[in-house]
C-alpha cells in the first residue's frame, strides 16, 4: 500500500494544504489501491479513473494559482450509489436503474464540489438501501476488509469497506435504520447519522422519506466532523430541511467526563459476549473519570423494529411506485399491453428483498389494515420520541453497542430475514425519533473483528456528540488496526 494512504485523514489534509503532496498524487494512490484490493473487496461498482484524475489535476492547478476552493480542495470522497451525480449512473444497486443517468446533482454533491472534493462514485449497497449486509445488491456482494468471508454491514457497505480498506479517506452513505452506523461498527469506522433535516435529502433516491439521512464515514473522527460541516445546512429544495445555525468544525471540543450523565442499557444473553465485555470496559473507564452512569429502561424499544419495518416498508411501497418502466426504470415490453409492461418491468427489475418490502408496505397501507398497522405504528413512533425526551431529561447522552454482534459470515442470515432485521435492534429507534447518533470504534473481538459503540444525543446536538466521541477516542482499547494486506 502506498505510504500516502497510511497517513491519518488530518495529516492528509494538512499535506494537501502545505503542498507536501498534490491531489494528483493522493488520487493516484487511491486508484492504485482500488486496483490492488477491490477485486477482492468489491466496494466499488464503477470508477471513472480518467475523470477523477482530471478533477485532481484541476485542484492542483487551483492550488498553484493560490486559489484553492477550500482547505478540502483535492480530497477524495466516495459516494454511495443512491446519491445523484449529474451525468453519472445512479443505480441504487438495482437492475431497474442500471442504465439511469442522473440529470442533476444532489445538494450534498453540489456542496462537496463547491469545496473542491474529488468525487469517487459509485460504491456498492443493498438494493435501494434495503438490507444490513450489502448482500442484496443486484450486482455484487461487498466483503469486509477485516475478513473477506464476512459482510461489511449495510446498506452502505460499499462506502464503509472502501474507507476501511484505505481505498479512500472519506465516504458518504445514507442511514434509514442504521445503514451508516452498522457498517461503521462492523468495519471499525466513525459513522454519523445526523439529526433528521440537518442534511438535505435532495438528490438522495428515497427509500423511506421520513427516516432517510445522508451521513459520513471516516477512519478518524475529524473526517466525519469536516464532512458534516460541509454537507449540513438548510436547502429550499428539500421540504424537510431545517434551518439551524451553521455548524462549525472548529467549535468541537473534547467533552469533560466529570459530571457527564451517561445513559446505559442492560445487556441481554443474545448479545455477543465480546461486545458486552468491550461495552463494560468503556463504562468502567467512564466511571473512573467521573461520569455518572444512569440505567435506562430500553425494554419498550423491543417494538422499535416492527414499528420501523411497518413505516419504512409503507413509505418504500409509495416511493418505489414511480419505477414502473415508463416514468423511471428499465422498460420490459413483451406483449405491448400497458399492465403487462408494469408487471414485467418491476418483476425483472427488482430483487427479492425489495419485492418483499414493497409487498409488506402495500399490505400495511391497504384499506382493511391501514389503521391496524400503519396508523398504530405512527402512534407508537410518537411514543418512542416521548420516551427519548424522557431519557434526555435525565442524561446528556446514551451509550450502547451499535450492533449486537461483530460481522457475520456471508450467507449466514440471508435465508432468515427476521434474523437479519434484528441486526438493527439498537439503531432503528434513533431514526424513528430523528435523533443524531454516531458509531465509534470500541476495539475488536478475538478474531480481530471491529466492535462499535453508538452515541446518541438530543436533537441538533451534533457538536456535543462529536465532543463525546473525541473524548471516548482517548480511552484504553478503543483503537482499531486496519488491514494493509487484503487477499
From Swiss-Prot:
Gene3D superfamilies: Amidase signature (AS) domain. It is an enzyme of class 6 (ligase). It catalyses: L-glutamyl-tRNA(Gln) + L-glutamine + ATP + H2O = L-glutaminyl-tRNA(Gln) + L-glutamate + ADP + phosphate + H(+). One of its GO terms (biological process) is translation. GO terms for molecular function: ATP binding; glutaminyl-tRNA synthase (glutamine-hydrolyzing) activity. GO terms for cellular component: glutamyl-tRNA(Gln) amidotransferase complex. InterPro entries: Amidase (IPR000120), Amidase_CS (IPR020556), Amidase_dom (IPR023631), AS_sf (IPR036928), GatA (IPR004412). Its EC number is 6.3.5.7. It comes from the Bacteria. The active site is at residues 80, 155, 179. Keywords: ATP-binding, Ligase, Nucleotide-binding, Protein biosynthesis. Pfam families: Amidase. Heterotrimer of A, B and C subunits. Allows the formation of correctly charged Gln-tRNA(Gln) through the transamidation of misacylated Glu-tRNA(Gln) in organisms which lack glutaminyl-tRNA synthetase. The reaction takes place in the presence of glutamine and ATP through an activated gamma-phospho-Glu-tRNA(Gln). Belongs to the amidase family. GatA subfamily. This is Glutamyl-tRNA(Gln) amidotransferase subunit A. It comes from Leptospira interrogans serogroup Icterohaemorrhagiae serovar copenhageni (strain Fiocruz L1-130). The lineage of its organism: Bacteria, Pseudomonadati, Spirochaetota, Spirochaetia, Leptospirales.
Amino acid at each position: 500500500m502506498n505510504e500516502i494512504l497510511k497517513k491519518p485523514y488530518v495529516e492528509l489534509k494538512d499535506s494537501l494544504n502545505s503542498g507536501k503532496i498534490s491531489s494528483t498524487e493522493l488520487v493516484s494512490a487511491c486508484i492504485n489501491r482500488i486496483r490492488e484490493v477491490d477485486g477482492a473487496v468489491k466496494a466499488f461498482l464503477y470508477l471513472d479513473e480518467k475523470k477523477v484524475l482530471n478533477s485532481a489535476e484541476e485542484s492542483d492547478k487551483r492550488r498553484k494559482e493560490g486559489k484553492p476552493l477550500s482547505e478540502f480542495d483535492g480530497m477524495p470522497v466516495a459516494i454511495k450509489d443512491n446519491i445523484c451525480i449529474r451525468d453519472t449512473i445512479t443505480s441504487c444497486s438495482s437492475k431497474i436503474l442500471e442504465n439511469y443517468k442522473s440529470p442533476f446533482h444532489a445538494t450534498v454533491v453540489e456542496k462537496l464540489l463547491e469545496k473542491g472534493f474529488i468525487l469517487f462514485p459509485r460504491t456498492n449497497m443493498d438494493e435501494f438501501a434495503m438490507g444490513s449486509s450489502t448482500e442484496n445488491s443486484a450486482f455484487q456482494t461487498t466483503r469486509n476488509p477485516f475478513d473477506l468471508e464476512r459482510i461489511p454491514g449495510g446498506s452502505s457497505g460499499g462506502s464503509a469497506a472502501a474507507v476501511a480498506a484505505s481505498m479512500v479517506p472519506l465516504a458518504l452513505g445514507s442511514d434509514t435504520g442504521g445503514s451508516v452506523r452498522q457498517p461503521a461498527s462492523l468495519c471499525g469506522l466513525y459513522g454519523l447519522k445526523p439529526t433528521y433535516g440537518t442534511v438535505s435529502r435532495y438528490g438522495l433516491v428515497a427509500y423511506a422519506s421520513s427516516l432517510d439521512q445522508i451521513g459520513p464515514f471516516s477512519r478518524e473522527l475529524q473526517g466525519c466532523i469536516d464532512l458534516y460541516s460541509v454537507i449540513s445546512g438548510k436547502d429550499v429544495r428539500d421540504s424537510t430541511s431545517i434551518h439551524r445555525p451553521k455548524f462549525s468544525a472548529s467549535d468541537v471540543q473534547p467533552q469533560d467526563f466529570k459530571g457527564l450523565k451517561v445513559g446505559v442499557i442492560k445487556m441481554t444473553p443474545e448479545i455477543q459476549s465480546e461486545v458486552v465485555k468491550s461495552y463494560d470496559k468503556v463504562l468502567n473507564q467512564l466511571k473512573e473519570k467521573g461520569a455518572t452512569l444512569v440505567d435506562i429502561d430500553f425494554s419498550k424499544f423491543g417494538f422499535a423494529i416492527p414499528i420501523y419495518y411497518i413505516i419504512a416498508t409503507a413509505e418504500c411501497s409509495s416511493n418505489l411506485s414511480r419505477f414502473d418502466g415508463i416514468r423511471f426504470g428499465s422498460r420490459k415490453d413483451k406483449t405491448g399491453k400497458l399492465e403487462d409492461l408494469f408487471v414485467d418491468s418491476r418483476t425483472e427489475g427488482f430483487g427479492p428483498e425489495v419485492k418483499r418490502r414493497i409487498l409488506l408496505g402495500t399490505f400495511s397501507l391497504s384499506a382493511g389494515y391501514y389503521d391496524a398497522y400503519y396508523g398504530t405504528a405512527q402512534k407508537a413512533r410518537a411514543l418512542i420520541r416521548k420516551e427519548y425526551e424522557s431519557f434526555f431529561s435525565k442524561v446528556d447522552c446514551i451509550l450502547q453497542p451499535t450492533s449486537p454482534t461483530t460481522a457475520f459470515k456471508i450467507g449466514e442470515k440471508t435465508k432468515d430475514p427476521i434474523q437479519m432485521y434484528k441486526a438493527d435492534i439498537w439503531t432503528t429507534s434513533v431514526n424513528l425519533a430523528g435523533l443524531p447518533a454516531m458509531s465509534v470504534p470500541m476495539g475488536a473481538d478475538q478474531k480481530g473483528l471491529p466492535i462499535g459503540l453508538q452515541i446518541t444525543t438530543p436533537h441538533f446536538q451534533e457538536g456535543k456528540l462529536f465532543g463525546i466521541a473525541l473524548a471516548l477516542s482517548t480511552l484504553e482499547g478503543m483503537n482499531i488496526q486496519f488491514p494493509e494486506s487484503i487477499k
